[in-house]
Each structure stands twice: as structure tokens, then as C-alpha cells.
Amino acid sequence: MSDQSELKNMGLKATFPRLKILDIFRKSDLRHLSAEDVYRALIAENVEIGLATVYRVLTQFEQAGILTRSQFDTGKAVFELNDGDHHDHLICTNCGTVFEFSDPDIEKRQYKVAKDNGFVLESHAMVLYGICGNCQKGR
């Protein structure tokens, strides 16, 4: 499906800023991008889209389900393409790199903990903080 069709299916017009920002996410080597990351990528491509427009489009994409937002301890929101698969995150407290992982045993345990405490789990997000392998090598 083309980006134009995807946006239209989500109820959004396929404007130049929306198409360009979606393209940035699709071709980025990084999976998690802040508004500032997107803005810098646009500048690097000599595309004139203001930071306020970037924030507005990211919010629209989040509301439409195209992107998901995470707020890690870094204090700034980061966005990633919503592929529909649940995953958790490991964050390096030294360099800020975000690693994704999925573990079925952890998922089962979380549902059990919720059930054992009288909860029906609707949603969850697990974020683990530590030092990544690359940063450990530099110590």
C-alpha cells in the first residue's frame, strides 16, 4: 500500500509534510525518533517544514495509529512506526540507545501478576534501563 493510500485510509489528507515525515520514519536507520530528530532529517534533505508542523503531524500520526509514542526517562517523547506487534524496550543510560525486545515468558508472567492481583490487564509498557554492550566496552 502506498503512503498516500495509507494516510487516506487513516482519514488523513496526503499532504507534502505528512508524506515527507512518514518517509523519514520509513527510511531511518533509527526506529525511535524524536520531533527534533525528524526536523533535523528534514533539514538534511533541504526540506522546509517547520518544527511546529513536525510536532503537529507526529500528534496526528499518533492519533491515527500510524505512530506510537514513548516517553522514556530522557524526558523527550520518541515515536516509532506502529507495526502492531507488542515489544518492550531496553534503554542505555549512557548513550541513550533504545533496544527493542519481546519475550513470551515475560508477557505471560505480567498477565499472571495482573490476574493474581485482581486485574484484567488492558495494556502495559516495560522499559528496562542499563548500560549497553558498546558502552560497557568503553569502560
Swiss-Prot record:
**InterPro entries in alphabetical order:** FUR (IPR002481), Fur_C (IPR043135), WH-like_DNA-bd_sf (IPR036388), WH_DNA-bd_sf (IPR036390)
What does the similarity note say?
Belongs to the Fur family.
Name one cellular component (GO) term. cytosol
Q: Which CDD domains match?
A: Fur_like
Q: What is its main location?
A: cytoplasm
Q: What is this protein called?
A: Ferric uptake regulation protein
Question: Which residues are Zn(2+)-binding?
Answer: 32, 80, 89, 92, 95, 100
Q: Where is this region: DNA-binding?
A: 1-83
One of the GO BP terms on file: positive regulation of DNA-templated transcription
For binding Fe cation, which residues are annotated in this chain's numbering? 86, 88, 107, 124
- UniProt subcellular location: Cytoplasm
Note whether Disulfide bond occurs among the keywords: no
Q: Which keywords belong to this entry?
A: Cytoplasm, DNA-binding, Iron, Metal-binding, Repressor, Transcription, Transcription regulation, Zinc
Do you know which Pfam families this protein is assigned to? FUR (PF01475)
How does it associate, per the subunit comment? Homodimer.
GO MF, one term, reads: zinc ion binding
Species whose genome carries this gene: Bordetella parapertussis (strain 12822 / ATCC BAA-587 / NCTC 13253)
User: What gene is behind this protein?
Assistant: fur
Q: Say what the protein does.
A: Acts as a global negative controlling element, employing Fe(2+) as a cofactor to bind the operator of the repressed genes.
Stretch list, region Dimerization: 84-139
Do you know which NCBIfam families this protein is assigned to? PRK09462.1 (NF006999)
